Amino acid sequence: MKSIIFFTNTFVIIFILNINSVRADFTAKVQRVVDGDTVHVIDKAGKKFKVRLTGIDAPEKNQPYGLAATYKLTEILINKLVLLKSKPNNGKPYTIDRYKRVLAKIILDGKDINLSQVLRGYAWHFKRYQKQQSPSDRELYSEAEIDAKKNELGLWEEKNPIAPWKWRKMKK
């Protein structure tokens, strides 16, 4: 009897852990690029979402390189069918931030678009939220930022670019 209870409890724990690690992936068409890390999409059922690209923080539009980051993301994503990868949270199949945006990694043709924004120097790796990333993504995004900086790509052409989170504080 004890062994049955033990195995039942073990199964329940494993099941709960697996549910929490499942990612809610869905496809949607990009309708609008708001800025270098936010897009509007519509899914196959016609539901519209605002999506915040996880793991990165792009310059604000009125900040140096903000328009370039927005333009580059538009060039790549506008009217494209993409895969959105998000984590289930609070009973929803995806995570939503305080601005009611779905937090997601965007995949286009197998390529991580969030990471490519960092690689090209159009965004910082948003280390404040890196614990929400997988260890491999954390490492990839961090290395991408180091490489972009070393190669003076995009915003790293400037000697000391101001990070968006600092820019927003200064503008309040």
Stretches with model-predicted labels:
Residues 2-11, 16-172:
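Small beta-barrel nucleic-acid-binding modules, primarily SNase/OB-fold domains
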